[in-house]
Amino acid sequence: MQKLQISVYIYLFMLIVAGPVDLNENSEQKENVEKEGLCNACLWRENTTSSRLEAIKIQILSKLRLETAPNISKDAIRQLLPKAPPLLELIDQFDVQRDASSDGSLEDDDYHARTETVITMPTESDLLTQVEGKPKCCFFKFSSKIQYNKLVKAQLWIYLRPVKTPATVFVQILRLIKPMKDGTRYTGIRSLKLDMNPGTGIWQSIDVKTVLQNWLKQPESNLGIEIKALDENGHDLAVTFPEPGEDGLTPFLEVKVTDTPKRSRRDFGLDCDEHSTESRCCRYPLTVDFEAFGWDWIIAPKRYKANYCSGECEFVFLQKYPHTHLVHQANPRGSAGPCCTPTKMSPINMLYFNGEGQIIYGKIPAMVVDRCGCS
């Protein structure tokens, strides 16, 4: 009994020496730990951002089948860039899309059909599309996007050289056909009469949707077209084979197709901003600036919102596959935890110069993170 009393006295004495327990100190320690966790999260997101930007550069070159970024100067771009209205409108559309999505609230819609514009430049013709051994303008090859989607519109754009005095110009578009018995090689497509004022040349568009539809149904009938634009004196004003100083004035096709949707609507994941303290798997904003890369060869867009995924994945939270949780419950040690990854991505349209100085308008798949989840 006496030993027990001595032990109690010693215990009380030590409590008095140690002083009262400071609950505020524990709170401060907890708060410091939380702040340290938030700082680590910010640092993690910074590293993720840098890695994502480098990955995007590699992906773009790979998906465009380019080993390195084309070395094209800004001066060369100014000389090569076509001055045609539809291309200028296309560039303007990139600006409109950028402004419309600047708040980050818009998401690519995979449910509804979308109309896309494809700019097709003429290619070199083969012997079959030549007349008397001379190549004729113009022969067009069509990508699978045009072949396998609904055709909405097809316009042939031609540039007419300026006239010195007011003139009436007769424009004729002819379709090349296989030689007939009488030697005929052409059949008419369109003809129109234009009144031109002196001073400047003009771009003129001609509807060729019916012709293009026939070509798509019977590819072997596509031997090319002949373009003529004669004034009263018989001078051909159409630029078919550009002369020096006529860069960017080559005829081309502007084709609009409706892209069929392939996926249905799904629920959205979490969206966060760069100042968010959310620790769970979330989509964060990330803007890719091609000018900052020094990639002048990309005409449009100059920048776009790519986004990235970051955060922790607890089981059952935003999991892509419901059975993932059941597998973990059955064997918690034998299954790796879920990771925060993109569960939905969308493409971007891009207007760019390839390594040969040609202008290409195409779609690069899976370049924008639309939704993040755990899988």
Swiss-Prot record:
Cleavable signal peptide? 1-18
Disulfide cysteine pairs (residue numbers)? C272-C282, C281-C340, C309-C372, C313-C374
Result for mutant: C313Y: In mh; Piedmontese breed
Q: Where in the cell is it found?
A: Secreted
Keyword line: Cleavage on pair of basic residues, Cytokine, Disease variant, Disulfide bond, Glycoprotein, Growth factor, Heparin-binding, Secreted, Signal
Family matches, as Pfam families? TGF_beta, TGFb_propeptide
Output the GO biological process annotations, alphabetical, semicolon-separated: cellular response to dexamethasone stimulus; muscle cell cellular homeostasis; myoblast migration involved in skeletal muscle regeneration; negative regulation of fibroblast proliferation; negative regulation of insulin receptor signaling pathway; negative regulation of myoblast differentiation; negative regulation of phosphatidylinositol 3-kinase/protein kinase B signal transduction; negative regulation of skeletal muscle tissue growth
Specify the propeptide location in this chain.
19-266
Q: PTMs?
A: Synthesized as large precursor molecule that undergoes proteolytic cleavage to generate an N-terminal propeptide and a disulfide linked C-terminal dimer, which is the biologically active molecule. The circulating form consists of a latent complex of the C-terminal dimer and other proteins, including its propeptide, which maintain the C-terminal dimer in a latent, inactive state. Ligand activation requires additional cleavage of the prodomain by a tolloid-like metalloproteinase.
Q: Which residues are glycosylated?
A: N47, N71
Sample GO molecular function, one term: heparin binding
- One GO cellular component term: extracellular space
Q: In which tissues is it expressed?
A: Specifically expressed in developing and adult skeletal muscle. Highest levels found in the hindlimb semimembranosus and biceps-femoris muscles; low levels in other hindlimb muscles.
* Keyword check for Secreted: yes
Report if keyword Amino-acid biosynthesis is assigned: no
User: Where along the sequence does the record put site: Cleavage?
Assistant: R98, D99
Assembly, in brief, is:
Homodimer; disulfide-linked. Interacts with WFIKKN2, leading to inhibit its activity. Interacts with FSTL3.
What family is this protein classified in?
Belongs to the TGF-beta family.
What is the stated purpose of this protein?
A: Acts specifically as a negative regulator of skeletal muscle growth.
Protein name per its UniProtKB record: Growth/differentiation factor 8
Native source organism of the sequence: Bos taurus (Bovine)
- List the top taxonomic levels of the source: Eukaryota, Metazoa, Chordata, Craniata, Vertebrata
Q: Which gene encodes it?
A: MSTN
